[in-house]
Amino acid sequence: MGSEMCIRDRIDEKLEGAKSAGAAHTINVLKEDLEEKIKEYTHGHGATVSIDAVCGNDSLIRLLKATGNAGRVITMGFSTSPTEINQFLITSKELDVRGSRLQNKMFGRAIELINEGKLDLTGSVSHTFPLLKAQEAFDFVGSHDPSIRKVVLTFDF
């Protein structure tokens, strides 16, 4: 039996993109309770692995609640805002909580896979800007436009 991916977000368009990219389930956390939906999708067990790429005010605590016994919770964001954690959730469920910067010496291999056409990033990059318009790109990202997925600077001279 394989794994099923469940994606959470606040923006329906991004959830639709995740669904079309292969996510088994999507949850709009503004409309649905994350913990309840995860329990429903996992027949009451909770998630085996949860990844917090948002690192918002309550995203980690939500994932700790939605992750099942002996599960793993990975944080990937770079928020400097303090987060209150209920240690009982970690200890009672025997959760493994880790931080990841995605720097496990695989970046070169990832580039190779992209160049070989073996890693499909269709839909991942929503906007590109030439390097000379870097400030415009940063301003655009700062606008929090809901259409933004990833913004890439290109080196077209």
Feature map (PLM): residue ranges:
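Short, small-residue-biased leader/transition segments that mark boundaries at the very start
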Residues: 1-6
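Short beta-strand "acidic-cap" motif of Rossmann-like dinucleotide-binding folds
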Residues: 7-8, 75
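Conserved SAM/SAH-binding beta-strand->alpha-helix loop
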Residues: 11
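Bulky hydrophobic/aromatic packing residues
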Residues: 15-17, 25, 46, 101, ...
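Glycine-rich cofactor phosphate-binding loops and adjacent beta1-alpha1 units
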Residues: 16-96, 156-157
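Alpha-helix initiation/capping motif
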Residues: 27, 40, 99-100, 123, ...
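C-terminal hydrophobic helical "lid"/dimerization subdomain
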Residues: 57, 61-64, 104, 108-157
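Rossmann-fold dehydrogenase core element
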Residues: 72-74, 84-124
